Amino acid sequence: MTNPIYLILADFFDRYIGEPPEKIHPVVFIGKLICFFENVFKSTNSVNKTRDLLFGFLNVILVLAIVFFMTYEIEQIINSISNSYIKISIYSIILSFSIGHKSLIEFSKAPIKFIVNNDLEGAKKSVQCIVSRNTSELDKKHILSASIESASENITDSIIAPLIYAAIFGLPGAFLYRAVNTFDAMIGYKSEKYQYYGKTAAYLDDILNFIPSRIAGMLLIISAPFYGGNIKSAIYGYFNEGNKTPSPNSGYTMATLANSLNMELEKIGYYKLGKGEITIEKALNSLKAVDYSVLLFLIIYTVLLM
Protein backbone atom coordinates (compact mmCIF):
# COMPACT_ATOMS: atom_id res chain seq x y z
CA MET A 1 0.00 0.00 0.00
CA THR A 2 1.17 3.51 -0.78
CA ASN A 3 2.43 5.73 2.04
CA PRO A 4 -0.48 8.01 3.12
CA ILE A 5 1.81 11.06 3.10
CA TYR A 6 1.99 10.79 -0.70
CA LEU A 7 -1.80 10.95 -1.01
CA ILE A 8 -2.18 13.73 1.54
CA LEU A 9 0.44 15.93 -0.11
CA ALA A 10 -0.84 15.14 -3.60
CA ASP A 11 -4.33 16.33 -2.71
CA PHE A 12 -2.89 19.37 -0.91
CA PHE A 13 -0.78 20.34 -3.94
CA ASP A 14 -3.73 19.96 -6.30
CA ARG A 15 -6.29 21.68 -4.04
CA TYR A 16 -4.19 24.73 -3.23
CA ILE A 17 -1.75 25.01 -6.13
CA GLY A 18 -3.68 23.44 -8.98
CA GLU A 19 -2.86 21.61 -12.16
CA PRO A 20 0.23 22.10 -14.35
CA PRO A 21 0.08 23.85 -17.74
CA GLU A 22 -1.58 21.84 -20.51
CA LYS A 23 1.73 21.43 -22.36
CA ILE A 24 3.11 19.24 -19.56
CA HIS A 25 -0.11 17.82 -18.10
CA PRO A 26 -0.07 13.99 -18.14
CA VAL A 27 -3.84 13.74 -18.65
CA VAL A 28 -3.60 16.03 -21.69
CA PHE A 29 -0.84 13.76 -23.02
CA ILE A 30 -3.12 10.76 -22.47
CA GLY A 31 -5.87 12.52 -24.41
CA LYS A 32 -3.49 13.12 -27.31
CA LEU A 33 -2.51 9.44 -27.28
CA ILE A 34 -6.17 8.47 -27.47
CA CYS A 35 -6.69 10.82 -30.43
CA PHE A 36 -3.57 9.52 -32.18
CA PHE A 37 -4.68 5.89 -32.09
CA GLU A 38 -8.25 6.86 -32.93
CA ASN A 39 -6.96 8.54 -36.09
CA VAL A 40 -5.04 5.36 -36.89
CA PHE A 41 -7.92 2.96 -36.24
CA LYS A 42 -10.99 5.03 -37.08
CA SER A 43 -10.15 7.29 -39.99
CA THR A 44 -13.81 7.69 -41.04
CA ASN A 45 -17.12 8.27 -39.28
CA SER A 46 -18.64 5.16 -40.86
CA VAL A 47 -19.88 2.53 -38.40
CA ASN A 48 -18.92 -1.14 -38.58
CA LYS A 49 -19.71 -3.10 -35.42
CA THR A 50 -17.00 -5.77 -35.59
CA ARG A 51 -14.28 -3.41 -36.77
CA ASP A 52 -15.16 -0.68 -34.28
CA LEU A 53 -15.34 -3.07 -31.32
CA LEU A 54 -11.93 -4.52 -32.21
CA PHE A 55 -10.17 -1.24 -32.91
CA GLY A 56 -11.76 0.45 -29.91
CA PHE A 57 -10.44 -2.38 -27.75
CA LEU A 58 -6.96 -2.06 -29.31
CA ASN A 59 -6.98 1.70 -28.72
CA VAL A 60 -7.65 1.15 -25.02
CA ILE A 61 -5.04 -1.61 -24.66
CA LEU A 62 -2.28 0.33 -26.42
CA VAL A 63 -2.83 3.55 -24.50
CA LEU A 64 -3.05 1.76 -21.15
CA ALA A 65 0.14 -0.18 -21.94
CA ILE A 66 2.02 3.03 -22.69
CA VAL A 67 0.67 4.76 -19.57
CA PHE A 68 1.58 1.78 -17.39
CA PHE A 69 5.11 1.50 -18.76
CA MET A 70 5.82 5.22 -18.36
CA THR A 71 4.38 5.58 -14.86
CA TYR A 72 6.00 2.35 -13.66
CA GLU A 73 9.42 3.53 -14.83
CA ILE A 74 8.89 6.98 -13.30
CA GLU A 75 7.90 5.38 -9.99
CA GLN A 76 11.01 3.19 -10.04
CA ILE A 77 13.23 6.21 -10.66
CA ILE A 78 11.59 8.17 -7.84
CA ASN A 79 11.92 5.24 -5.43
CA SER A 80 15.64 5.07 -6.16
CA ILE A 81 16.16 8.59 -4.80
CA SER A 82 17.97 8.34 -1.47
CA ASN A 83 16.85 11.68 -0.02
CA SER A 84 13.41 10.97 1.45
CA TYR A 85 12.28 14.62 1.34
CA ILE A 86 13.05 14.92 -2.36
CA LYS A 87 11.47 11.54 -3.06
CA ILE A 88 8.25 12.38 -1.19
CA SER A 89 8.02 15.80 -2.86
CA ILE A 90 8.50 14.56 -6.42
CA TYR A 91 6.19 11.57 -5.96
CA SER A 92 3.44 13.71 -4.43
CA ILE A 93 3.67 16.41 -7.09
CA ILE A 94 3.43 13.88 -9.92
CA LEU A 95 0.57 12.06 -8.18
CA SER A 96 -1.27 15.38 -7.79
CA PHE A 97 -1.50 15.56 -11.60
CA SER A 98 -3.94 12.62 -11.48
CA ILE A 99 -6.33 14.52 -9.18
CA GLY A 100 -8.79 17.26 -10.13
CA HIS A 101 -9.82 18.62 -6.73
CA LYS A 102 -9.21 22.33 -7.35
CA SER A 103 -10.63 22.32 -10.88
CA LEU A 104 -13.74 20.46 -9.69
CA ILE A 105 -14.45 23.14 -7.09
CA GLU A 106 -13.70 26.04 -9.43
CA PHE A 107 -15.78 24.78 -12.37
CA SER A 108 -18.70 23.83 -10.13
CA LYS A 109 -18.64 27.14 -8.27
CA ALA A 110 -18.55 29.30 -11.42
CA PRO A 111 -22.26 28.88 -12.36
CA ILE A 112 -23.24 29.51 -8.74
CA LYS A 113 -21.39 32.85 -8.79
CA PHE A 114 -23.25 33.90 -11.94
CA ILE A 115 -26.58 33.00 -10.29
CA VAL A 116 -25.65 35.06 -7.22
CA ASN A 117 -25.00 38.02 -9.55
CA ASN A 118 -28.33 37.43 -11.36
CA ASP A 119 -26.51 36.66 -14.62
CA LEU A 120 -28.56 33.76 -15.97
CA GLU A 121 -26.93 33.76 -19.42
CA GLY A 122 -23.47 33.70 -17.88
CA ALA A 123 -24.56 30.82 -15.66
CA LYS A 124 -25.84 28.87 -18.68
CA LYS A 125 -22.55 29.29 -20.53
CA SER A 126 -20.57 28.42 -17.43
CA VAL A 127 -22.48 25.25 -16.62
CA GLN A 128 -22.20 24.13 -20.26
CA CYS A 129 -18.49 23.58 -19.58
CA ILE A 130 -19.18 20.84 -17.03
CA VAL A 131 -22.28 18.99 -18.30
CA SER A 132 -23.20 17.41 -21.63
CA ARG A 133 -26.86 18.52 -21.68
CA ASN A 134 -28.29 21.49 -23.58
CA THR A 135 -28.20 24.38 -21.10
CA SER A 136 -29.78 27.10 -23.25
CA GLU A 137 -33.28 26.54 -21.82
CA LEU A 138 -32.32 25.82 -18.21
CA ASP A 139 -33.73 27.96 -15.42
CA LYS A 140 -31.97 28.91 -12.18
CA LYS A 141 -33.03 25.71 -10.41
CA HIS A 142 -31.76 23.41 -13.14
CA ILE A 143 -28.49 25.33 -13.56
CA LEU A 144 -27.77 24.92 -9.85
CA SER A 145 -28.82 21.29 -10.10
CA ALA A 146 -26.45 20.63 -13.02
CA SER A 147 -23.58 22.26 -11.14
CA ILE A 148 -24.22 20.19 -8.00
CA GLU A 149 -24.70 17.00 -10.01
CA SER A 150 -21.34 17.55 -11.70
CA ALA A 151 -19.58 18.23 -8.41
CA SER A 152 -21.08 15.21 -6.65
CA GLU A 153 -20.42 12.83 -9.57
CA ASN A 154 -16.85 14.03 -9.94
CA ILE A 155 -16.03 13.47 -6.28
CA THR A 156 -15.51 9.92 -7.51
CA ASP A 157 -14.00 10.52 -10.94
CA SER A 158 -11.67 13.39 -10.11
CA ILE A 159 -10.57 12.66 -6.55
CA ILE A 160 -11.66 9.57 -4.62
CA ALA A 161 -11.12 6.99 -7.38
CA PRO A 162 -7.60 8.14 -8.37
CA LEU A 163 -6.66 8.29 -4.68
CA ILE A 164 -7.99 4.76 -4.10
CA TYR A 165 -6.07 3.35 -7.06
CA ALA A 166 -2.97 5.30 -6.03
CA ALA A 167 -3.29 3.87 -2.52
CA ILE A 168 -3.36 0.31 -3.84
CA PHE A 169 -1.24 0.45 -7.00
CA GLY A 170 0.83 3.63 -6.70
CA LEU A 171 1.43 6.00 -9.62
CA PRO A 172 0.53 3.40 -12.29
CA GLY A 173 -2.81 2.76 -10.60
CA ALA A 174 -3.74 6.44 -10.40
CA PHE A 175 -2.81 7.24 -13.99
CA LEU A 176 -4.26 4.05 -15.47
CA TYR A 177 -7.54 5.02 -13.83
CA ARG A 178 -7.30 8.57 -15.21
CA ALA A 179 -6.55 7.14 -18.64
CA VAL A 180 -9.71 5.03 -18.54
CA ASN A 181 -11.68 8.00 -17.24
CA THR A 182 -10.32 10.16 -20.06
CA PHE A 183 -11.24 7.47 -22.57
CA ASP A 184 -14.80 7.45 -21.25
CA ALA A 185 -15.05 11.24 -21.48
CA MET A 186 -13.75 11.28 -25.06
CA ILE A 187 -15.25 8.20 -26.72
CA GLY A 188 -17.37 6.43 -24.10
CA TYR A 189 -20.63 8.27 -24.72
CA LYS A 190 -23.48 6.82 -26.77
CA SER A 191 -23.27 8.52 -30.14
CA GLU A 192 -23.53 6.89 -33.55
CA LYS A 193 -19.81 7.31 -34.18
CA TYR A 194 -18.72 5.77 -30.87
CA GLN A 195 -21.56 3.33 -30.12
CA TYR A 196 -19.20 0.38 -30.72
CA TYR A 197 -15.77 2.00 -30.80
CA GLY A 198 -16.24 3.38 -27.30
CA LYS A 199 -17.81 0.29 -25.70
CA THR A 200 -14.60 -1.08 -24.17
CA ALA A 201 -13.79 2.31 -22.66
CA ALA A 202 -17.31 2.78 -21.28
CA TYR A 203 -17.49 -0.69 -19.74
CA LEU A 204 -14.03 -0.42 -18.22
CA ASP A 205 -14.87 2.97 -16.72
CA ASP A 206 -18.04 1.51 -15.17
CA ILE A 207 -16.05 -1.38 -13.70
CA LEU A 208 -13.28 0.79 -12.24
CA ASN A 209 -15.78 3.24 -10.73
CA PHE A 210 -18.06 0.61 -9.21
CA ILE A 211 -16.37 0.40 -5.80
CA PRO A 212 -14.97 3.98 -5.60
CA SER A 213 -18.40 5.52 -6.31
CA ARG A 214 -19.96 3.57 -3.47
CA ILE A 215 -17.11 4.45 -1.13
CA ALA A 216 -17.51 8.11 -2.09
CA GLY A 217 -21.22 7.90 -1.29
CA MET A 218 -20.45 6.45 2.12
CA LEU A 219 -17.94 9.24 2.77
CA LEU A 220 -20.69 11.77 2.03
CA ILE A 221 -22.92 10.02 4.56
CA ILE A 222 -20.33 10.03 7.36
CA SER A 223 -19.20 13.61 6.73
CA ALA A 224 -22.76 14.99 6.40
CA PRO A 225 -22.79 16.92 9.72
CA PHE A 226 -19.68 18.86 8.67
CA TYR A 227 -21.17 20.27 5.46
CA GLY A 228 -24.66 20.95 6.83
CA GLY A 229 -26.22 17.66 5.77
CA ASN A 230 -28.32 15.04 7.51
CA ILE A 231 -26.89 11.55 7.99
CA LYS A 232 -30.27 9.79 8.11
CA SER A 233 -31.44 11.44 4.89
CA ALA A 234 -28.09 10.74 3.24
CA ILE A 235 -28.41 7.04 4.08
CA TYR A 236 -31.92 7.02 2.59
CA GLY A 237 -30.65 8.58 -0.64
CA TYR A 238 -27.72 6.17 -0.90
CA PHE A 239 -29.78 3.01 -0.53
CA ASN A 240 -33.05 4.07 -2.17
CA GLU A 241 -32.07 6.40 -5.01
CA GLY A 242 -28.46 5.52 -5.79
CA ASN A 243 -29.50 3.29 -8.67
CA LYS A 244 -31.96 5.73 -10.28
CA THR A 245 -29.57 7.24 -12.83
CA PRO A 246 -28.61 5.82 -16.25
CA SER A 247 -25.05 5.42 -14.98
CA PRO A 248 -24.52 2.44 -12.65
CA ASN A 249 -22.22 4.54 -10.47
CA SER A 250 -22.85 8.30 -10.48
CA GLY A 251 -26.21 8.06 -8.72
CA TYR A 252 -24.70 7.01 -5.41
CA THR A 253 -22.94 10.30 -4.74
CA MET A 254 -25.63 12.45 -6.35
CA ALA A 255 -28.55 10.83 -4.51
CA THR A 256 -26.68 10.81 -1.21
CA LEU A 257 -25.83 14.50 -1.45
CA ALA A 258 -29.29 15.50 -2.72
CA ASN A 259 -31.06 13.82 0.17
CA SER A 260 -28.47 14.85 2.73
CA LEU A 261 -29.02 18.53 1.91
CA ASN A 262 -32.80 18.17 1.33
CA MET A 263 -32.78 19.33 -2.29
CA GLU A 264 -34.01 17.97 -5.61
CA LEU A 265 -31.48 17.32 -8.36
CA GLU A 266 -33.02 16.83 -11.78
CA LYS A 267 -31.77 16.06 -15.26
CA ILE A 268 -34.93 16.64 -17.24
CA GLY A 269 -36.18 13.46 -18.86
CA TYR A 270 -33.68 11.25 -17.05
CA TYR A 271 -33.95 11.37 -13.26
CA LYS A 272 -35.00 13.22 -10.14
CA LEU A 273 -33.08 12.70 -6.92
CA GLY A 274 -34.04 13.99 -3.48
CA LYS A 275 -36.71 16.51 -2.56
CA GLY A 276 -36.61 20.14 -1.57
CA GLU A 277 -35.63 23.53 -2.93
CA ILE A 278 -32.11 24.17 -4.17
CA THR A 279 -30.71 27.31 -2.60
CA ILE A 280 -27.38 29.08 -3.00
CA GLU A 281 -26.46 27.98 0.51
CA LYS A 282 -27.14 24.34 -0.32
CA ALA A 283 -25.15 24.64 -3.55
CA LEU A 284 -22.17 26.03 -1.66
CA ASN A 285 -22.56 23.34 1.01
CA SER A 286 -22.31 20.79 -1.80
CA LEU A 287 -18.82 22.07 -2.54
CA LYS A 288 -17.95 21.84 1.15
CA ALA A 289 -19.11 18.22 0.95
CA VAL A 290 -16.42 17.56 -1.64
CA ASP A 291 -13.68 18.85 0.65
CA TYR A 292 -14.94 17.05 3.75
CA SER A 293 -15.44 13.71 2.01
CA VAL A 294 -11.88 13.82 0.64
CA LEU A 295 -10.49 14.83 4.03
CA LEU A 296 -12.37 11.96 5.65
CA PHE A 297 -10.99 9.49 3.10
CA LEU A 298 -7.43 10.62 3.78
CA ILE A 299 -7.93 10.38 7.55
CA ILE A 300 -9.44 6.88 7.35
CA TYR A 301 -6.70 5.66 5.01
CA THR A 302 -3.97 7.05 7.25
CA VAL A 303 -5.47 5.49 10.38
CA LEU A 304 -5.84 2.10 8.67
CA LEU A 305 -2.14 2.08 7.78
CA MET A 306 -0.85 3.23 11.16
UniProtKB/Swiss-Prot annotation:
Q: Which UniProt keywords apply?
A: Cell membrane, Cobalamin biosynthesis, Membrane, Transmembrane, Transmembrane helix
Q: Please tell me one Gene Ontology term that the record gives under cellular component.
A: plasma membrane
Pathway(s) of this molecule = Cofactor biosynthesis; adenosylcobalamin biosynthesis
Q: Which terms does the record give in the GO molecular function aspect?
A: ABC-type vitamin B12 transporter activity; threonine-phosphate decarboxylase activity
Localization recorded for this chain is: Cell membrane
The record lists the membrane-crossing segments as: 54-74, 88-108, 155-175, 215-235, 286-306
Native organism: Methanococcus maripaludis (strain C7 / ATCC BAA-1331)
Q: Which GO terms describe its biological process?
A: cobalamin biosynthetic process
Instruction: Name the job this protein performs.
Output: Converts cobyric acid to cobinamide by the addition of aminopropanol on the F carboxylic group.
Protein family membership: Belongs to the CobD/CbiB family.
Q: Which NCBIfam families match?
A: cobal_cbiB
Question: What name does UniProt use for this protein?
Answer: Probable cobalamin biosynthesis protein CobD
Q: Does the keyword Membrane apply?
A: yes
Membrane topology, as annotated, equals: Multi-pass membrane protein
* InterPro entries reported in the protein's UniProt record: Cobalamin_biosynth_CobD/CbiB
